[in-house]
Amino acid sequence: MKTSRLPIAIQQAVMRRLREKLAQANLKLGRNYPEPKLSYTQRGTSAGTAWLESYEIRLNPVLLLENSEAFIEEVVPHELAHLLVWKHFGRVAPHGKEWKWMMESVLGVPARRTHQFELQSVRRNTFPYRCKCQEHQLTVRRHNRVVRGEAVYRCVHCGEQLIAK
């Protein structure tokens, strides 16, 4: 388990939650799925990722430190569910009906696709864009795609194309 200056108490809480939910899933599914590898190497605005082939969960140490309780309650089971779905059903839609079932019926956790954590500390440079109704901040990656002509982004509220300020 790789660490990134995380207090041992937080690492232990993550492991407790992971083992608790894994045991719960194994009991409900009548299986004996192994404990996944766990690392704290996720970067950027993603709270975590599940790597199917290596059976690994990567967690974002910055977001974990800033949102410990909610992170442990929500993100750890979320990523575990991806691995369990892959083991149980094979390759399916990432947040499809199998994942939702695993989250709600097996793990007993609300099936939320995205986190609501404050991202200021992990967000890199953004670029201002406008539509009819508001200003938007595009990431460097999205901005570069617009500049290269590879993408066009629209406002989810008014449907207008976003234009650089």
From Swiss-Prot:
InterPro entries: SprT-like_domain, SprT_Zn_ribbon, Uncharacterised_SprT. Its cofactor is Zn(2+). Gene3D superfamilies: Metalloproteases ('zincins'), catalytic domain (3.30.2010.10). One of its GO terms (molecular function) is zinc ion binding. The active site is at residue 79. Binds 1 zinc ion. Zn(2+) binds at residues 78, 82. SMART domains: SprT. Residues 20-162 form the SprT-like domain. It is found in: Cytoplasm. GO terms for cellular component: cytoplasm. This is Protein SprT. It comes from Escherichia coli (strain SMS-3-5 / SECEC).
